Amino acid sequence: MEDFVRQCFNPMIVELAEKAMKEYGEDLKIETNKFAAICTHLEVCFMYSDFHFINEQGESIVVELDDPNALLKHRFEIIEGRDRTMAWTVVNSICNTTGAEKPKFLPDLYDYKENRFIEIGVTRREVHIYYLEKANKIKSENTHIHIFSFTGEEMATKADYTLDEESRARIKTRLFTIRQEMANRGLWDSFRQSERGEETIEERFEITGTMRRLADQSLPPNFSCLENFRAYVDGFEPNGCIEGKLSQMSKEVNARIEPFLKTTPRPIKLPDGPPCFQRSKFLLMDALKLSIEDPSHEGEGIPLYDAIKCMRTFFGWKEPYIVKPHEKGINPNYLLSWKQVLAELQDIENEEKIPRTKNMKKTSQLKWALGENMAPEKVDFDNCRDISDLKQYDSDEPELRSLSSWIQNEFNKACELTDSIWIELDEIGEDVAPIEYIASMRRNYFTAEVSHCRATEYIMKGVYINTALLNASCAAMDDFQLIPMISKCRTKEGRRKTNLYGFIIKGRSHLRNDTDVVNFVSMEFSLTDPRLEPHKWEKYCVLEIGDMLLRSAIGQMSRPMFLYVRTNGTSKIKMKWGMEMRRCLLQSLQQIESMIEAESSVKEKDMTKEFFENKSETWPIGESPKGVEEGSIGKVCRTLLAKSVFNSLYASPQLEGFSAESRKLLLVVQALRDNLEPGTFDLGGLYEAIEECLINDPWVLLNASWFNSFLTHALR
């Protein structure tokens, strides 16, 4: 059969059929009848279109010989034979320019004279059976169906055959010839019997054994077996009364399907209340680093040695005092804790040999800050069964918080470039396959765009802090260990740099379960005056600890240096995910890759180089009250990375819930934009589910605000 196909059909048609089978993962050496069927279908589509034009007067004419003087437009747009992405691009373009309704399945042709899509069918069976199967699958009055058979029969929607008698006769003659040629070679019977109906994957997929019994058991009431249920579902009219069907299925259901129009959605309601506060485990845009370049000191790489070396670079220490107290805490204890850190670091420096780790003295201020002996005593449940008024602690509902501008500023800052390189290119051997070459080229381009990004600094800082804290939690369970907050990078000139952001002191850490909590006190350097946005620093006690000389264009100036101190906590599972923050790079690279793939499939060649090197082109980054924001491909990379990093830094049940529920609304809005006429029921319930996730989390509130901007501009 394969030899026959290659002899009988035009090489271009054979090549297109090969590509189509490859795209669907089918082997033409095995599925030879399918190979022949695809070639036949392609040829009929091309013959349907051949010689049909529209002249200047808009009339349909048949021109067999090319007349160079005629200003003619092809009557039919051929969609069949293109790869799926390109085919859908053509369909979307036609819908946009002609106002035609977008079909649910890829049609074969578009008729510019009748302004309709056409589905061509070629069958080896009865034409009316195949026609009904096609109509049942497409379920659209706007796509015209035209079926041909190898016996010369044809059938079309409303008996409207589109083409003139002669053009259709040409197609029928060609099909009859193919049949005769196959019969002469003894191939026809096998080819005729191999045709299957317009099936879906589910119909072909036989369910047997345990799965079959489970399927039969899990049917809605009033259905005895899966076949009955399937037949019932297949009988649903596409535009019939769904509400009635639902109420037939169950007396409990009384859903009413409402059309979803541009005027239907309302903005998500953000909560009122005091402004939200910073809740990340470490400072982001407000962090200050004490740094050493080209570190070569004794013990370089040992965190405590590096920290002491960094501390020595600063000479502006002064007697610390509180500038912004914590509303509920015993603030003098925070001040005493910092003084204790300074004193114990001084003690280390006075020793002959600096130790590798430092356990702090268990002073009253540290015991208070780390919640030592604060946990209620655990009692075995069996010992208190008889207590009549046994109940769980009453816990207050969380206070609602409103969106504050600082979180948008944090995000903007995370997208910016720094003057340091935070990740190196992976050391990978020579590429051995073309796909590896493309993958490493994409990775290298992407790395170049994000290696200087502040979000990448947050990744490396997060990885370091979580790794150090988890190690200390396992290695020194009973100790109040001092953990320097360190990161490493390179300057633009390539010199190595070690940075100190501050210190963590961890509490007792007998972590048996993944969710068991270890308390810690963080002390972080900053030049940000907390009195400018006191609501952001609700959970912090802020000290002024020194004065820093800064060089600027107008000379040297002195700025107060602050220390942001707070009690915090984390768990084994959170630290494990914190150590995995490099995954954010992979996630955002995959998102960029899917953009490149879409572009490449339209252009039918790899577009990686053009994608990254065409600096003049702009891409959509996100929504703001001003509209769709656009930027360079580098800005897109950094924005996607920052979103992924913030999802990690601000991970919470509120974020999980908001992401899952708002996605449903997003899909409905997208369906409306694609003219799919979506319908919804209980839209109010969906809004309720979304809005119950908007409590006090700054990142969730910002995402909800972005979603509202998207709704405004998407539905204009």
From Swiss-Prot:
Its cofactor is Mn(2+). Binds 2 manganese ions per subunit. A motif (Nuclear localization signal 2 (NLS2)) lies at residues 184-247. Keywords: Cap snatching, Endonuclease, Eukaryotic host gene expression shutoff by virus, Eukaryotic host transcription shutoff by virus, Host cytoplasm, Host gene expression shutoff by virus, Host nucleus, Host-virus interaction, Hydrolase, Inhibition of host RNA polymerase II by virus, Manganese, Metal-binding, Nuclease, Phosphoprotein. It is found in: Host cytoplasm; Host nucleus. One of its GO terms (cellular component) is host cell nucleus. GO terms for biological process: cap snatching; DNA-templated transcription; symbiont-mediated suppression of host gene expression; symbiont-mediated suppression of host mRNA transcription via inhibition of RNA polymerase II activity; viral RNA genome replication; viral translational frameshifting. Disulfide bonds: none annotated. Its EC number is 3.1.-.-. Mn(2+) 2 binds at residues 80, 108. Phosphorylated on serines and threonines by host kinases, including human casein kinase II. Influenza RNA polymerase is composed of three subunits: PB1, PB2 and PA. Interacts (via C-terminus) with PB1 (via N-terminus). This is Polymerase acidic protein. It comes from Influenza A virus (strain A/Memphis/101/1972 H3N2). The gene is PA.
